[in-house]
Amino acid sequence: MINVNVPKSTFNEVYVPHIENTSRKQIYYGGSSSGKSVFLAQRDVIRLMRGGRNVLVCRQVAKTLRGSVVQEIRKVISKWGISDLFDINKTDGTVTCSANGYQIVFAGLDDVEKLKSITPARGVFTDVRIDEATETTRDSIKQLEKRQRGGSEETEKTLTLSFNPIYQGHHLYTDYFAPLGWRTDQTEYNTPDLS
C-alpha cells in the first residue's frame, strides 16, 4: 500500500462516508455538478494505490470515456501531485499504479462481448463502475457483474452505477429503487448489499 496524505477536505463532504464503502452494489445519482464523477475518480485512485483492487470503468460508448472519466482520473492524479506513481497508456487510457501493478481499465459497452476478453495485468476486476448508467441496458449491467467472478473471496467486489436523475419507468429505477419502496424525498439507503 502506498501512503499518500489526502486531506478529507479534498472530498465533497457528502461523499466522505463513502470513501470506505464496500457495499456490493453502489448507486450515486444526482444532477450535473453534484460532484459524483469527481468523487468516484478520487475513490478509484485511492483504491488503486492501496493495492489489491483493479477497476473496470465503463460507459455505453467507448469513445466518450476519454473526454470524461479518463480525464477526471488524470486530473485527480495531477491535482494530488502523484503523477510519478502512475503510468497512463496514451492509446486506451489505462492507468497503472507503477508501485503495485494494479489498474484502472476503460471499456465501452458498444459491444458487450468484447468485455469477455478484458483482463487487468494483475489479478481480477474487483470494482466495476458504470458511468452514465442510464445509457446502458439491463443486459450490459448483468454481463459486467459476471466479469467480477474469480479472485479472492475475501476481497469485496463492488458494482458502482452513477447517473443523473431518472424517470420511474427506467430499468434502473425498476431494478434498484422500486423494490426498496424508494420515496422521492430520500437521499440515501444503506445495507451491506446496496448503498
Model-flagged regions — what are they?
Residues 1-195:
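Phosphate/NTP-binding elements of NTP-utilizing enzymes
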